């Protein structure tokens, strides 16, 4: 239970709770705006050619080329080689250039999605690859270069999601409608945490308008993924198996019980018109 009181200080309120929830977790819930957005996605098959072209262009840019690697032994520059006249000799090999893959060096596992014949294993999958958090700034820089960004549709936005792997992001290609999502969470009327086969999920329910919009959105995206973004953070991108009617949907994503519980609180409360900031806790 929450108790909200007006503060004597302008622009401030006091929020009290009888929960034993840790303060950092409570502050995250309290300061969440609760903005929910649903996006269609691009499949890897739709943008694979653009990614290969981006990697090629980056590899030809002088600032991203790898240095040449010599085939001579290390420290050979001060050695003298004497060959008898008429003896078989091997001409010094020319320097070779190391294979240059600037984009795929940081966008990992993309190329592993192709079989030995160069065909995509799952062309409808929307996950583009993984990126180490330490390399994320480099990947963002590459994708924002004019020569690279123009290769992709104007409606495409690359989104980042914490993966189950340590210090790694999953990279997903979102499809926007002139920068906007396909649907928002304004028609969500309730949200609750449920357990399904031992997994923690969040079940949401829409009003009649939202139910109709959700049915239409899922009907047009069968065998594709829909991404859910909360407060600007990608949280899941489930694959749509069939049209979903009835105004209900389950959100799954390997959530812990705390994550699923917090998400249900945020979604069930609706979006706030402004973002709160904690100035003091007691």
What do these predicted ranges mean?
Residues 230-231, 238, 245-281:
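Extended, hydrophilic extramembrane loops/domains of integral membrane proteins
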């Amino acid at each position: 239970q929450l108790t909200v009181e007006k503060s004597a200080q302008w622009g401030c309120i006091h929020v009290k709770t009888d929960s034993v929830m840790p303060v950092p977790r409570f502050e995250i819930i309290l300061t969440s705006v609760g903005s929910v957005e649903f996006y269609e996605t691009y499949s890897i098959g739709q943008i694979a050619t653009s990614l290969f072209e981006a990697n090629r262009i980056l590899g030809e840019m002088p600032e991203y080329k790898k240095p040449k690697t010599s085939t001579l032994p290390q420290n050979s520059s001060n050695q003298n080689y004497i060959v008898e006249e008429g003896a078989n000799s091997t001409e010094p090999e020319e320097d070779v250039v190391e294979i240059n893959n600037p984009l795929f060096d940081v966008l990992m596992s993309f190329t592993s999605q192709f079989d030995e014949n160069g065909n995509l294993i799952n062309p409808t999958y929307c996950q583009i690859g993984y990126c180490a958090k330490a390399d994320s700034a480099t990947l963002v820089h590459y994708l924002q270069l004019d020569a690279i960004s123009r290769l992709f549709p104007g409606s495409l936005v690359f989104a980042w999601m914490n993966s189950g792997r340590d210090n790694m992001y999953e990279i997903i290609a979102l499809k926007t409608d002139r920068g906007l999502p396909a649907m928002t969470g304004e028609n969500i009327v309730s949200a609750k945490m449920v357990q399904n086969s031992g997994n923690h999920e969040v079940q949401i329910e829409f009003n009649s308008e939202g139910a109709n919009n959700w049915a239409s959105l899922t009907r047009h995206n069968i065998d594709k993924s829909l991404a859910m973004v909360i407060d600007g953070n990608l949280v899941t991108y489930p694959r749509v198996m069939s049209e979903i009617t009835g105004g209900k949907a389950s959100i799954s994503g390997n959530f812990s019980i705390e994550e699923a519980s917090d998400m249900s609180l945020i979604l069930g409360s609706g979006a706030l018109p402004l973002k709160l900031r904690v100035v003091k806790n007691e």
